[in-house]
Design a protein with these regions (language model features):
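Conserved N-terminal phosphate-binding loop of PLP-dependent enzymes in the Aspartate aminotransferase
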Residues: 1-268
């Protein structure tokens, strides 16, 4: 960051930003993604993910498929659409009329999930590891079933990895061990290493809907943020680093957590 700060901090995204191109390629190389849009935060990345899902169905002539199905008491950010996506009264109370377009199901209740899918559902959006809702880990088999369900219903799968992605689980993405390929993934906290960066990753199919003018950001993808992201990627994408994250957890943190297992429900 110090090195880049002595050069160029910000320039209009009408110009090519080499640092951003490099970071996008690194993210694509280490993920399912074919296309990346940079933001400044997790909430922005989540809202962009919602836009991408809705725009995709609009682009293929199905504009009424615009509803996003989320988990009750999840957390997707603090902007107005994100709080209503979260399905939590404490998040939405006092913030005016309800933002429409979101439906909710109970974590772990597969019947509830299936019943809530309608002809207007565009995507299922879940946190791979729930944070605000109680550190609930979606099992690999469940992620695989979610992918199959989305394929069957011809809807998109959005895995929100803003909080748990980019090495924080000991894998580059928390969903990696499931071998699932989502359609859209918002990221933020892990890629910035403390600096405000966000991004939404997507596959080629949905990226075709995001033509010039459908989304943008004044500061998203600026040279300073991209330089930070590149440095983080060089460290966190290293397999030795990721293995050490797992080792530290098992050897140092797991023993201190064991007493809690006797008193609290374990969801993973």
């Amino acid at each position: 960051m110090n090195k880049q700060s002595k050069k160029l901090w910000h320039v209009s995204n009408a110009f090519i930003i080499p640092e951003g191109e490099i970071l996008a390629k690194k993210l694509a190389k280490n993920s399912f993604a074919d296309f990346v849009i940079f933001q400044n935060s997790g909430a922005e990345a989540t809202e962009a993910a919602i836009k991408v899902a809705r725009r995709y169905f609009y682009s293929i002539g199905k504009p009424k498929k615009n509803r996003i199905l989320c988990v009750k008491n999840s957390f997707h950010g603090r902007t107005i659409a994100a709080i209503f996506a979260s399905g939590s009264k404490k998040m939405t109370e006092g913030f005016g009329p309800k933002v429409s377009g979101f439906d909710h199901f109970t974590f772990g209740d597969h019947n509830s999930l299936k019943k809530k899918i309608s002809k207007n559902t565009a995507a299922i959006m879940v946190e791979t590891i729930m944070g605000e809702g109680g550190i609930k880990v979606i099992p690999d088999w469940c992620l695989r079933d979610l992918r199959k369900l989305c394929n069957k219903k011809k809807i998109l799968l959005i895995l929100d990895e803003v909080q748990c992605g980019i090495g924080r689980s000991g894998d580059f993405f928390a969903f990696e061990s499931s071998k699932v390929k989502p359609d859209i993934v918002p990221i933020a906290k892990g890629i910035g290493g403390g600096f405000p960066i966000g991004a939404v990753l997507m596959n080629k199919k949905v990226s075709k809907a995001m033509v010039p003018g459908t989304h943008g950001s004044t500061f998203g993808g600026n040279p300073l943020a991209m330089s930070v992201g590149n440095t983080v990627m060089d460290i966190v994408s290293n397999r030795k680093f990721l293995n050490n994250v797992k080792k530290l957890f098992l050897n140092h943190y797991m023993p201190s957590l064991k007493p809690f297992f006797l008193h609290f429900e374990i969801f993973c």
